[in-house]
Amino acid sequence: MINTEGTKSLEAVDIEELLSILPHRYPFLLIDRIVEIDGEQQAIGIKNITINEPHFMGHFPAKPVMPGVLILEAMAQTAGAISLLRLGNKQTNLVYLMTVDNAKFRKPVIPGDQLKIHVRLLKKRSGMRRFSCVAEVEGVRVAEAEIAAMIIEAE
């Protein structure tokens, strides 16, 4: 299927395919699936937050809150996954996070929440990508940022 921008729309991506695309593994694979993809232009990733995640042992034991930096990493993994999917060469490239700008954390993310991560490509130049990212829980914005990443060939 081709959309109006001429980029290929892809099927949703489950955890098995994410494992074949991204190098991240437990406890640092921070997306469970991608439910909507429009080529490399935009996507929606899902992260189900559970009390069993190791960061909750210390952040914070009496009132667990997902660290903001891990929300940013989930955004980066969603953006990286769609960039690598578009290239079509799984595990032959890596995506490195280069910058995070205008990060804002608006509400805490706690166990039981489902984080919905919206990423939208803002700029593409050679191996560089810039994305606008928004994380929501039940339709309420909990975090946002702009990120830049570089795609490099894996050695």
Swiss-Prot record:
In its UniProt record, which GO terms are filed under biological process? fatty acid biosynthetic process; lipid A biosynthetic process
Q: Where in the cell is it found?
A: Cytoplasm
Instruction: Please tell me whether the keyword Cytoplasm is annotated for this protein.
Output: yes
Active-site residue list: H59
Coiled coil spans: none
* Subcellular location, principal: cytoplasm
Claim: NAD is one of the keywords in the record = no
Q: Which GO terms describe its molecular function?
A: (3R)-hydroxyacyl-[acyl-carrier-protein] dehydratase activity
UniProt-listed Enzyme Commission number(s): 4.2.1.59
Entry superkingdom: Bacteria
Reactions the enzyme catalyzes: a (3R)-hydroxyacyl-[ACP] = a (2E)-enoyl-[ACP] + H2O
**Which keywords fit this entry according to its UniProt record?**
Cytoplasm, Lipid A biosynthesis, Lipid biosynthesis, Lipid metabolism, Lyase
Cite the CDD domains for this sequence. Answer: FabZ (cd01288)
- List the GO terms this entry assigns under cellular component, sorted alphabetically: cytoplasm; membrane
Role of this protein: Involved in unsaturated fatty acids biosynthesis. Catalyzes the dehydration of short chain beta-hydroxyacyl-ACPs and long chain saturated and unsaturated beta-hydroxyacyl-ACPs.
Entry's family note: Belongs to the thioester dehydratase family. FabZ subfamily.
Against NCBIfam families, the record matches this protein to: fabZ (TIGR01750), PRK00006.1 (NF000582)
- Matching HAMAP family: FabZ
Name of protein: 3-hydroxyacyl-[acyl-carrier-protein] dehydratase FabZ
Where does this protein come from, organism-wise?
A: Bartonella quintana (strain Toulouse)
Q: Which gene carries the instructions for this protein?
A: fabZ
